[in-house]
Amino acid sequence: MSWCRCNRPPVRRFDGDRLVIASHNAGKLREIAALLAPFGITVSSAADHGLKEPEETEDTFVGNARIKAHFAAQATGLPALSDDSGITVDALDGQPGVYTADWAETPNGRDFPMAMTKVWTMLEEKSAPLPRKAAFNATLVLAWPDGHDEVFKGRAEGEVVWPARGDKGFGFDPMFLPAGETETFGEMDPNRKHEMSHRADAFRKLVTGCFA
């Protein structure tokens, strides 16, 4: 399998008109589909193809994004775009990180209000000083059925705040306040969020590398 490395310029352009989004996360699907809309690409999800979620066995965003993208590309015979992302909190030594979604897992599905409460409780127990700096990190992997891929990383700096605010985002968005802003990602208009999010940062690099 020919996997690219992030320290070299992308060399393969995307020249198709169909793309699989290798995710079952409805929030991510909406956000990525909106970012891809200007390119006239027909987008389908992993669920549209009846794909199960592959086991994410890596301990990095890049590793897990590659697992998802290559699984979808090989299963469908179409190029596939995956995202692996999470929030890292400085005072928690970078947790939850790649385990961001795992922190929300319950027997009845993911409970992000519970996960956000857990993060804040841990910070309170440590008497972490304010502002409680954090960052959202995103890695996008565009994979082709022949095993080639391109990797793009994005980041949004900010802090976590309490109480969580807003219902426009998903995941940890309601407790993440981007640097220099007064609204959390959960309060922010989606178009405004798309201008500054970690995923948008990675997406701009993807567009420059593979679509421009």
Predicted regions and their residues:
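Cysteine-centered motifs
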Residues: 4-6
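Anionic-ligand binding patches
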Residues: 12-20, 26-212
